Amino acid sequence: IIDPGLGFSKPGIEHNLPLLTGLETFRATGYPVLIGQSRKRFISAMLTGAGTAGADGPTMAQRDDVTAALSALSAEHGAWAVRVHDVAKSRAAVIAGNTWREYA
C-alpha cells in the first residue's frame, strides 16, 4: 500500500495538493493507494485561502466537509481507500460521485 503522507512535514496547500492531483502517478506503480487527508491542516488552508493553516482556522466539522469532497475526488481518481474521521459524510460523498458518473 502506498500512502503519500499528506500533511506530514507538509503543512501547506502547495505541498499536499500536488500529491492528490498526482494520484495516477502513485496508481501507476500497481500498488493500492491510501489517501489520509482527514482534517489535515492543509484543508484549513484551503478554506481560508491562507496557503498554510493558522491557529484560528475552520472547525473540525468544516474540515470534515472538505474531507468528504476530497474523498469523493480521490475515489474518482482511483484511490484504494481513504482514511477519515467522519465515515458517514465521506461515504455519502463517494456514493454521490459514483451515482453522478453512472448517469453521465
Regions found by a protein language model. Name each.
Residues 8-104:
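Active-site-adjacent loop and "lid" segments of alpha/beta metabolic enzymes
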